[in-house]
A protein has these predicted regions:
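Transmembrane alpha-helical segments that form the membrane-embedded catalytic/substrate-channel core
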Residues: 17-25, 98-112, 187-196
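Membrane-embedded alpha-helical segments of multi-pass transporters/permeases
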Residues: 24, 73-74, 149, 166, ...
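Loop-to-transmembrane alpha-helix initiation sites
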Residues: 138, 154-161, 173-185
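Short, non-helical or kinked segments that cap or interrupt transmembrane helices
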Residues: 34-46, 113-126, 153-161
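Nucleotide and nucleotide-moiety/phosphate-recognizing core
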Residues: 7, 11, 57-61, 67-113, ...
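N-terminal signal-anchor transmembrane alpha helix
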Residues: 6-31
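Interfacial segments of multi-pass membrane proteins
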Residues: 48-54, 76-79, 103, 107, ...
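Cytosolic, membrane-interface loops and tails of multi-pass inner-membrane proteins
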Residues: 25-58, 118, 198-215
Length: 215
């Protein structure tokens, strides 16, 4: 059991460190010599980066946030799978993925190297759920895409994942530990989107367009 906790803490620390590599902040600060957090919504995420800077460097943000999630979960699996306590009802890969995924998201949202001012975790989170289980990903991504296409509110689709991920996790695994981890993940997503939710309710949230809207 002692070795398990050492491995669990190591997986969490590495996943958090991976999450701290925020693509929007890195590209804006070190390539564009600017800070995406000083523009638009102030969020260090893909949507605000695209609205502010646009262009091909957006793909650099996507690549960074996707790769860090992959690395976090691969390392988490290497450290944990085969070393978890006996008797767990679910697949070991699921426990390691949810554990590493949670801390990767915390690193993305609260990066120690960027004054704990990060993004809202949707791109990294979307990558994580794809790696966890295609059924969880289908529900989360499906709900996100449907809501965004119907309403043009990225924040509405993003916020919905805070609900759909725990629900789909329970439907797929029927496991209390995985449900708890998914609720913590979903709760952080909703918390990071609390301002967007308030603006949605007030009718003042900005809609998303790939091109500037013609007035």
């Amino acid at each position: 059991m002692g070795e398990f906790w050492i491995r669990a803490v190591a997986a969490a620390a590495i996943a958090y460190f991976c999450g701290c590599f925020n693509g929007a902040v890195i590209v804006s600060k070190y390539i564009l010599r600017d800070d995406v957090r000083t523009h638009g919504s102030g969020n260090a995420g893909l949507t605000n980066f695209y609205r502010t800077f646009g262009g091909p460097l957006t793909f650099g943000v996507i690549l960074t946030d996707v790769l860090k999630a992959i690395v976090a979960l691969v390392v988490g699996g290497w450290l944990l799978v085969g070393h978890l306590p006996a008797g767990l009802p679910g697949p070991q890969e699921a426990y390691s993925d949810y554990w590493a995924g949670l801390f990767c998201l915390l690193g993305h949202m609260f990066p120690c190297m960027f004054q704990f001012k990060g993004g809202k975790g949707i791109l990294s989170g979307g990558t994580i759920v794809i790696m966890i289980d295609w059924r969880v990903a289908l529900v989360a991504w499906g709900g996100f895409l449907i809501l965004v296409l119907l309403t043009r509110y990225v924040s509405l689709g993003s916020s919905s994942t805070g609900v759909t991920v725990p629900i789909s996790t329970w439907l797929v695994y029927h496991d209390g530990i995985l449900l708890l981890l998914s609720i913590i993940i979903g709760g952080h997503i909703l918390w990071k989107h609390r301002g967007n939710i308030q603006r949605l309710l007030a009718g003042t949230e900005s809609k998303f367009y790939f091109h500037k809207k013609v007035k």
